[in-house]
């Protein structure tokens, strides 16, 4: 008699090595389910995560009720501060004095409220809260403040009454995103920072970015922009990662409506817009942030040794506290509901999910992911966050910045995962840095490069990238600068002949092409890196004389046709458009199933891996990619066994228009040659001329 097959979580069925940890995976799922029930009492989680509609400052405008009676307008402010004994509004409206008319009253569960007549506050006025507790007091910015401004003279941050007319969306109708890209497309993400997007030595604005930079991104072909540093942060040089005010779009870049116009314009151009969401920690500042908000160190954060992050000089949220969950989950919904963001890149996920913050950990086996070092509360929070986000916007994009490789982060919640749509392939940029720095050209192994590009959990979508903002920061180097270094200043102009520059330009294109063409979900680049922007990023600070010289983007370099920057930009444009057109999410063919496991994009099928020649070839769908990493040898009539048929060159890194040598004639059609040994399998020999240090992409014709 046959025994009934044991039922496993889907993630375990896909990865049998997870069987010893199935109870831990099931426990995580059950904990998130129990917590959701505890929080909502059975209601919809996204309907519960609406703290921003209750807390903070709200203007209820005058109206006429159903009986024709005029109802006066009013202001209502609510705050959660359980340890407070008294709270007052201080600001321009009362000459910054402690005023009983502006005193909040306790209404239960640590919540305070004040209702004021409409004339009591005006648009543009600055204000703070004076919070008193037993044994002390302090000025605080409301935790749900939607606009926070720094005084140009005193440098002090205050909340600002903000009551501008409601923005009229052009591309937001009944949940539709105008011409926003199809969910069938792979993501091509352009990571950007508003403030440093100007060529001028200044802080750029939302409006200038929308007008000047957004068209550049759209023309390049990227279908998603990832905006850094949106949440308000006191220190510009933190790159937006020391957040103080989680519901306030940074005022140093402009107004809320100007940010909405930027997002609206991007949607109209067919692009998704996601933001860096920092829920992994918070700035320590008390006057600007949440630290000791009501006089206690543990209102939002852990108490004791777990309160301060050992490496980041910041505070760590207590994800096991219901009020903190309400705050953070409401924050997820707020940015979608109020600004029409399409999702988030969650910063610092590794730091969140391990009690050690991942510091000093090797993560060399599955035991690392399921031991006592895991913060179950953080995983529960991330699970609920993904659920809220996708309830509010089903086609939202969530990306985990996670370096340990924990299984299941980018796996559906119901199947045993945490629910992210993608995870960053953080090992790829580290690989490129190591290879460029430590490995001689003749030792670059084509098969090893291919392995590093495709070494991942195939059932979890990833975002691959050769470099992001991290690699461009002061003290580090971008790929182009590692390859070319100071020769960029003297030999990056047409007409110059320089081996270092020629080598660097060739490898820059090849590195980006193999990284982008082997993706399992998406590809990312940072603003300016696509054209080889020179130098590192260094925000204004005391050590550089508060200079903006290296906190900007020199667009004039790429706009000058005499520089190689324009050629690199042209290559990136052609590459992105080509890959977007062909790397569509689809079901695998029978042959693809035979060679690879996975389900997201056309499979990567390797056809050639010749270590001695430094040549590798692979296909995706109807595209064939051939890389010759050999810096010394070009190969004539190089034979590669591929599906028989006609092939046409659609991209060549060595083309003159991309600052190559243009050795090959790309107009020639290529036909496979008959081989009786392989003909029964439908394969033949493709004979190609492969210039040294180049890559070519061919399309198989019908």
Please provide the spans of the model-predicted regions:
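Beta-strand-rich binding/interaction modules
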Residues: 77-79, 85-100, 635-653
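Short strand-edge motifs at loop-to-beta-strand transitions and within beta-strands
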Residues: 102, 110-114, 684-686
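Carbohydrate-binding surface patches
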Residues: 57-59, 64, 69-83, 606-641, ...
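Conserved alpha/beta catalytic core and glycan-binding cleft of carbohydrate-active enzymes
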Residues: 340-342, 361-551, 580-639, 651-654, ...
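The feature marks proteins involved in alpha-glucan
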Residues: 1-74, 106-191, 196, 201, ...
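Conserved, mostly hydrophobic/aromatic
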Residues: 79, 129, 192, 217, ...
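Substrate-binding/active-site clefts of carbohydrate-active enzymes
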Residues: 149, 167, 172-189, 193-374, ...
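C-terminal beta-strand-rich structural cap/linker in extracellular carbohydrate-active enzymes
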Residues: 123-125, 666-702
């Amino acid at each position: 008699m046959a025994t009934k097959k044991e039922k496993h979580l889907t993630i375990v069925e896909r990865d049998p090595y997870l069987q010893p940890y199935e109870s831990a995976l099931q426990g995580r799922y059950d904990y998130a389910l129990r917590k959701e029930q505890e929080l909502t009492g059975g209601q919809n989680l996204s309907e519960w995560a609406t703290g921003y509609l209750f807390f903070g400052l709200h203007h209820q405008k005058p109206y006429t009720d159903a009986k024709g009676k005029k109802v006066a307008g009013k202001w209502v402010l609510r705050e959660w501060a359980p340890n407070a004994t008294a709270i007052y509004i201080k600001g321009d409206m009362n000459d910054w004095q402690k005023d009983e008319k502006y005193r909040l009253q306790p209404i239960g569960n640590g919540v305070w409220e004040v209702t004021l007549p409409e004339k009591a506050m005006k648009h543009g006025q600055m204000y703070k809260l004076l919070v008193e507790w037993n044994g002390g007091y302090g000025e605080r910015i409301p935790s749900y403040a939607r606009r926070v401004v720094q005084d140009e003279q005193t440098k002090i941050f205050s909340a600002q009454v903000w009551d501008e007319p409601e923005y009229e969306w052009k591309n937001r109708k009944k949940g539709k995103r105008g011409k926003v890209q199809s969910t069938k497309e792979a993501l091509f993400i352009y990571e950007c920072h508003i403030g440093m997007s100007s060529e001028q030595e200044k802080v750029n604005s939302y409006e200038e970015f929308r007008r000047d930079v957004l068209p550049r991104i759209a023309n390049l072909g990227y279908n998603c922009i990832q905006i850094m540093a949106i949440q308000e942060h006191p220190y510009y040089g933190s790159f937006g990662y020391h957040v103080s005010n989680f519901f306030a779009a940074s005022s140093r870049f402009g107004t809320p409506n100007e940010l909405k116009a930027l997002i609206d314009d991007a949607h109209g151009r067919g692009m998704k817009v996601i933001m860096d969401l920092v829920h992994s920690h918070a700035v320590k500042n008390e006057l600007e942030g949440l630290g000791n908000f009501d006089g206690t160190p543990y209102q939002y954060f852990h108490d004791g040794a777990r309160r301060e992050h050992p490496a980041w000089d910041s505070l760590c949220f207590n994800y096991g506290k219901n009020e903190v969950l309400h705050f953070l989950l409401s924050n997820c919904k707020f940015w979608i509901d109020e600004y029409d963001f399409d999702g988030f890149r969650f910063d610092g996920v590794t730091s969140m999910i391990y009690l050690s913050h991942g510091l000093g950990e090797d993560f060399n086996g599955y035991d690392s992911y399921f031991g006592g070092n895991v913060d179950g509360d953080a995983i529960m929070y991330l699970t609920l966050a993904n659920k809220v986000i996708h309830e509010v916007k089903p086609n939202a994009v969530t990306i985990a910045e996670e370096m340990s490789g924990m299984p299941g982060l980018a796996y559906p919640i119901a199947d045993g995962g945490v629910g992210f749509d993608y995870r960053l392939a953080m090992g790829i940029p580290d690989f490129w840095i190591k290879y460029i720095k430590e490995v001689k050209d003749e030792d670059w192994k084509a098969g090893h490069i291919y392995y590093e590009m495709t070494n991942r959990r195939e059932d979890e979508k990833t975002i691959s990238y050769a470099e992001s903002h991290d690699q461009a920061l002061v003290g580090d180097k971008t790929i182009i600068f590692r390859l070319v270094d100071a020769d960029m200043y003297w030999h990056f102009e047409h007409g110059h002949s320089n081996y270092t520059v020629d080598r660097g330009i060739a490898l820059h294109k090849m590195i980006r092409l193999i990284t982008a063409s082997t993706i399992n979900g998406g590809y990312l680049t940072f603003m300016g890196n696509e054209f080889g922007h020179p130098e590192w990023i260094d925000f204004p600070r005391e050590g550089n004389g508060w200079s903006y010289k290296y906190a900007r983007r020199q667009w004039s370099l790429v706009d000058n046709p005499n520089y190689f920057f324009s050629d690199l930009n042209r290559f990136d444009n052609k590459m992105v458009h080509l890959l977007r057109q062909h790397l569509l999410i689809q079901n695998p063919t029978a042959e693809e199933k035979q060679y690879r496991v996975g389900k997201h994009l056309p499979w990567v099928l390797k056809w050639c891996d010749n270590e001695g020649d430094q040549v590798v070839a692979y296909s995706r769908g109807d595209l064939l990619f051939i890389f010759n990493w050999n810096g010394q040898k070009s190969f004539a009539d190089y034979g590669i066994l591929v599906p028989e048929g006609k092939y046409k060159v659609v991209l060549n890194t060595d083309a003159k228009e991309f600052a190559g040598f243009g050795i090959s004639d790309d107009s020639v059609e290529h036909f496979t040659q008959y081989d009786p040994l392989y003909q029964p399998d439908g394969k033949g020999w493709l004979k190609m001329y492969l210039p040294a240090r180049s890559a070519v992409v061919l399309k198989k014709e019908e």
